[in-house]
Structure formats: structure tokens, C-alpha cells
């Protein structure tokens, strides 16, 4: 039986949609936009209403110009000051609060990266609202879906806060198109630096391999590699596949590789076209960070390893024999 909505209900729904507005906090490196910001913009457009982006930094004109071309954005707000050089949460929060107050945004969001996870809880606390972390779907402007229990269950969260503050899992939303947009650009509200923290320096490891969360192919190693030196087997294979290299928490805790390579619930969430798990047993925390990969290949000598339960292809064999053989075959192609 079909029941027509009352005119008053339709007017309220239309009014609610009309007054929805979302502020996306852009993550960037001054000259380039972090890919997860494009995924976050897609999530923001699902809410309905106007989407704006806030770009804070130093000499970030190029990023602002690039964002103006992104589909789905109505306005780009730019704030440039030496205080924003390191994108510290202590300095960005007053800027975000002032911007929200000026435009009365109903939603504030950022990618669920280290940047977003550090910034948004502080913003939410200052607004006296509860943040929603790592959402994977949007059901309505006040209803979101996130994973719990290491990805084994879905939790639907209805948020009644005056301002909804949430972080977005990048792998759950397509990247917004980087062309076709015609957003306007203007200066954001100026705020005085709080000077609680001081940005000194940042030293990043240089690599010819793609960044882990944005790579189309990822090769990850676990405790089965037995040492950090043996990760060279994975580096050689990754070079042939133009892949990024990751690791399980067990490998990181054992000191084989640095923690910025960790894939899993407490590490990085990846969803590449191809994920090759080498010597990884498949703890639930690791699976939570890679199970959305399009194709999963597992190499482990233990046929009962949990990783085989999520793998599309499994190789039960000694990794120290199989991986070099794979590398040699690829070299000949």
C-alpha cells in the first residue's frame, strides 16, 4: 500500500536538505592534495547541500586552485599563515571553529588518516559534540555506518548533535573527479595563532615505490619472514610489480620494519587491486585493514592459517622459495 507524504513533511524534508552544508578539511602537502581528501569530498556530497573545502597552510595556492576544479565543491576557503605550516591540530582547530561559526556548517569532516584522527576529536571537543570515526557509508545526513569488532560487525550510528563531526574511511568511497568543478575561492576567517605547540621539522622516507594507502598493488610481510633483512625479498618482488610494501603488526612489533608500514586495524587501511600477503597468518586485526582488497593472494606454509579464509588465491609453500621464483619470472617478462 502506497501512502503519500503529507505536504508538511515534504516541506520539512526539502528544508532540511536545503540547509545542509558540509565543511571538508583538506589534507595536503602545500603543493599536492592527499588522495584521501578526494574520497572525503565524495562522502560529503552524499549528505546533500553545499560542500565547501578549507585549505590551511603556507603557499598552498596550487592546492586551492586544484580543489576549485574538483567536482561537487561549491566553495574553497583558503587560510595561509606560518602557524599552519605543520597542520597542527592546536592551530587548525580555532580556524575551523571560526569558519563553522561564520557559515554555520551542519557537518565537518576529514579523511580518517593520521591527520584527520588527530584533528577532528579536538574540533568535536571544542564544539562539545561527539565525533563519529572512520565511517564507511552514509544513510542520511544524521545516520552513518562504521565497522566495529575489527571489521566483523557494522554499527549504524544516528547522530543528533547540532554539528556532525566525522572522519571518512577513504577506501569506502570513490575519489571525486578532479575536473569539471567550478568552485569559487575566498579567504577564510583569520584567527590568532594559539602557540601551544611549535612545528619544527618533518623528515620523510624517500621511496620510488607508491604510497601504501594509494597503491594499486601491495605486498605485505609478516612474522614468517623471520627478520628485517628478509624483507628484501618483498622489496624485490614489489619493484617488479610497481607495488607498495606493507607489514603485519607482528612484523612491526618484532622490529623488522618501521610502524608506518603497518597494515591493519591500528595501522593503515588499504584496498588495492591486488594484495599479496606473505608469511602473514591473518590475525583479525590485520584482516580489518586489507579485507576490502579486490584480489587477495596469500603465501603461507601453514594450510590452516586464517589468511586463507579471505584469500582469493592461496599458495601453501615456503615463502623463501616461492617469492624469489615469482620475482625471477616477473623479471623475464
Swiss-Prot record:
Region (Domain I): 20-204
Record lineage: Eukaryota, Metazoa, Chordata, Craniata, Vertebrata
Transit peptide in keyword set: yes
Places the protein is found: Mitochondrion matrix
Family affiliation: Belongs to the ETF alpha-subunit/FixB family.
Organism: Macaca fascicularis (Crab-eating macaque)
Cellular component terms (Gene Ontology): mitochondrial matrix
Binding sites annotated in the UniProt record for FAD: 223, 248, 263-266, 281-286, 300, 318-319
Residue positions where Phosphoserine is found in the record: 140
Subunit field text: Heterodimer composed of ETFA and ETFB. Identified in a complex that contains ETFA, ETFB and ETFRF1. Interaction with ETFRF1 promotes dissociation of the bound FAD and loss of electron transfer activity. Interacts with TASOR.
Cleaved signal peptide residues: none
Interval spanned by the transit peptide: 1-19
Modified residue annotations for N6-acetyllysine: 59, 62, 69, 75, 101, 139, 158, 164, 203, 226, 232
Protein name in the entry: Electron transfer flavoprotein subunit alpha, mitochondrial
Function: Heterodimeric electron transfer flavoprotein that accepts electrons from several mitochondrial dehydrogenases, including acyl-CoA dehydrogenases, glutaryl-CoA and sarcosine dehydrogenase. It transfers the electrons to the main mitochondrial respiratory chain via ETF-ubiquinone oxidoreductase (ETF dehydrogenase). Required for normal mitochondrial fatty acid oxidation and normal amino acid metabolism.
Post-translational modification Phosphothreonine, affected residues: 93
Ranges for region Domain II: 205-333
Listed InterPro entries: DHS-like_NAD/FAD-binding_dom, ETF_a/b_N, ETF_a/FixB, ETF_alpha_N, ETF_asu_C, ETF_asu_C_CS, Rossmann-like_a/b/a_fold
Domains (record comment): Domain I shares an identical polypeptide fold with the beta subunit ETFB though there is no sequence similarity.
GO MF term (any one): flavin adenine dinucleotide binding
GO biological processes: fatty acid beta-oxidation using acyl-CoA dehydrogenase
A Pfam short name: ETF_alpha
Cofactor: FAD
Cofactor note: Binds 1 FAD per dimer.
Residue numbers of N6-succinyllysine PTMs: 59, 69, 158, 187, 203, 216, 226, 232, 301
Keywords: Acetylation, Electron transport, FAD, Flavoprotein, Mitochondrion, Phosphoprotein, Transit peptide, Transport
Amino acid at each position: 500500500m502506497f501512502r503519500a507524504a503529507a505536504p508538511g513533511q515534504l516541506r520539512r524534508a526539502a528544508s532540511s536538505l536545503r540547509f545542509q552544508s558540509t565543511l571538508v578539511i583538506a589534507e595536503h602537502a602545500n603543493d599536492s592534495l592527499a588522495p584521501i581528501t578526494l574520497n572525503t569530498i565524495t562522502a560529503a556530497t552524499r549528505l546533500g547541500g553545499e560542500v565547501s573545502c578549507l585549505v590551511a597552510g603556507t603557499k598552498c595556492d596550487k592546492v586551492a586552485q586544484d580543489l576549485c576544479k574538483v567536482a561537487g565543491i561549491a566553495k574553497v576557503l583558503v587560510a595561509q599563515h606560518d602557524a599552519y605550516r605543520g597542520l597542527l591540530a592546536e592551530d587548525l582547530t580555532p580556524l575551523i571553529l571560526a569558519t563553522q561559526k561564520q557559515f554555520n556548517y551542519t557537518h565537518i569532516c576529514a579523511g580518517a588518516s593520521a591527520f584527520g584522527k588527530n584533528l577532528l576529536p579536538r574540533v568535536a571537543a571544542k564544539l562539545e559534540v561527539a565525533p563519529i570515526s572512520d565511517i564507511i557509508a552514509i544513510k542520511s545526513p544524521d545516520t552513518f555506518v562504521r565497522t566495529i569488532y575489527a571489521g566483523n560487525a557494522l554499527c549504524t550510528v544516528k547522530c543528533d548533535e547540532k554539528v556532525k563531526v566525522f572522519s571518512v574511511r577513504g577506501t569506502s568511497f570513490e575519489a571525486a573527479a578532479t575536473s569539471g568543478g567550478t568552485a569559487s575561492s575566498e579567504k577564510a576567517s583569520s584567527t590568532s595563532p594559539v602557540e601551544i605547540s611549535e612545528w619544527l621539522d618533518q623528515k620523510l622516507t624517500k621511496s620510488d615505490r607508491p604510497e601504501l594507502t594509494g597503491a594499486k598493488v601491495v605486498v605485505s610481510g609478516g612474522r614468517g619472514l623471520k627478520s628485517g633483512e628478509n624483507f628484501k625479498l618483498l622489496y624485490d618482488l614489489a619493484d617488479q610489480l610497481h607495488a607498495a610494501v606493507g607489514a603485519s603488526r607482528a612484523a612491526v612489533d618484532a622490529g623488522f620494519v618501521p610502524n608506518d608500514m603497518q597494515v591493519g586495524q591500528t595501522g593503515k587501511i588499504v584496498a588495492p587491486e591486488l594484495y599479496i600477503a606473505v608469511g602473514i597468518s591473518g590475525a583479525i586485526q590485520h584482516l580489518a585493514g586489507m579485507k576490502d582488497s579486490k584480489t587477495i593472494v596469500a603465501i603461507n606454509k601453514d594450510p590452516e592459517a586464517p589468511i586463507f579464509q579471505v584469500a582469493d588465491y592461496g599458495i601453501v609453500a615456503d615463502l623463501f622459495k616461492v617469492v624469489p621464483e615469482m620475482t625471477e619470472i616477473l623479471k623475464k617478462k
